[in-house]
Amino acid sequence: VMDYLLNFLNSSTAEMLIGILSPTVSLNVGEISNLPALDVGVCNPHISQRLVELFHSDWDARETSWDFARPPYLRGGHSLLQDAFDDWYRRSCETAVEAQRLETENNRYWADVYSLADEVEVDVPLSRVSLTYNPRFAFAPTKGAPERSEEEYRWLHYQRSARELISWAIGVTMGRYSVDMPGLV
């Protein structure tokens, strides 16, 4: 049941139906319970489970997470910081593309179930995949601004990674973290 709800409520179909039932910014349990529920049998639980894994891992890569161990770019065993940042950028982009594919697959499934394939947008732009480390989301240009180049996204990602590395290094110096052990000391 939980996978069913996660998949459905995170679909563009549910977003459209909620917009019809509750056109204001207020959303209450009543509007959710009024959504037309179809007995569709089995939805693909892999989608919601994998998306939860991806987003949880993304969150745990941040120092503000209770489960933060160490900066993710320090886990690859690279001898050069440039190589570590390159690998982290590549993995961040790959994770964002995987999440985009799963979200699109989920949207397509629910649009087909409700026969709304021509009414709702099923494709998810990479800039809407709200992973913290998705460069296209984190550094999306403001409305009306020109699109950024791949090199600009990479550079902004490196800058943020460098700031986070400095923060972690200060934490190590102050005794909050250890180079030898993951997480808080």
Residue ranges and their predicted role:
Residues 1-185:
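S-adenosyl-L-methionine
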